[in-house]
Amino acid sequence: MAYGTRYPTLAFHTGGIGESDDGMPPQPFETFCYDSALLQAKIENFNIVPYTSVLPKELFGNIVPVDTCVKSFKHGAVLEVIMAGRGAALSDGTHAIATGIGICWGKDKNGELIGGWAAEYVEFFPTWINDEIAETHAKMWLKKSLQHELDLRSIAKHSEFQFFHNYINIKQKFGFCLTALGFLNFENAEPAKVN
């Protein structure tokens, strides 16, 4: 029996940071720091598969904090995510990393919700920062990116943009910061018909 393409109907937002004085080349921050960031984000026991940025309209109003659904997580399952995540070495002059994800929703000419798009933000800082700086920078760059996504498609904004951010001030040799959307529940579109 044929079935159509799969799309998510429930998502969660999360974030995490990690740092370490140890790591393996060529990207030492990808080893222990990344694992620590996944642990803090509560997604360390998933097999992570990255998504691009298109969100079905069924996710509108169905993006929840990670703590509301963590009890449903299955060890070893595949988790499809949109992730803004990067690592850095203190020796390269990076002392802080900020990450974020923004979401916009578009509407058609009748005002009906079409669906949404996400944008990712990563920025390196030569000094330590605070949450206000991380949030301000994330919103500034994500607003620009989200508006571009709407303008490129000639689609009007349906509702207010949504933003999630995270940051780390690196105190050890290596650091990693991530902000992510994870997708849990799915449905299938109608099977395609070819004329």
From Swiss-Prot:
Thermostable. Retains 48% activity at 50 degrees Celsius, and 13% activity at 100 degrees Celsius. It is found in: Cytoplasm. Pfam families: PvlArgDC (PF01862). Keywords: Cytoplasm, Decarboxylase, Lyase, Pyruvate, Virulence. One of its GO terms (molecular function) is arginine decarboxylase activity. Optimum pH is 3.4. GO terms for cellular component: cytoplasm. Its EC number is 4.1.1.19. Trimer of an alpha-beta dimer. This is Pyruvoyl-dependent arginine decarboxylase AaxB. The modification Pyruvic acid (Ser) is found at S53. Inhibited by argininamide. The keyword Amino-acid biosynthesis does not apply. Its main location: cytoplasm. The lineage of its organism: Bacteria, Pseudomonadati, Chlamydiota, Chlamydiia, Chlamydiales. It catalyses: L-arginine + H(+) = agmatine + CO2. The record marks T52, S53 as: Cleavage (non-hydrolytic). Binds 1 pyruvoyl group covalently per subunit. Belongs to the pyruvoyl-dependent arginine decarboxylase family. One of its GO terms (biological process) is arginine catabolic process. The gene is aaxB. InterPro entries: Pyr-dep_his/arg-deCO2ase (IPR016104), Pyr-dep_his/arg-deCO2ase_sand (IPR016105), Pyruvoyl-dep_arg_deCO2ase (IPR002724). Its cofactor is pyruvate. Part of the AaxABC system, catalyzes the decarboxylation of L-arginine. The arginine uptake by the bacterium in the macrophage may be a virulence factor against the host innate immune response. It is an enzyme of class 4 (lyase).
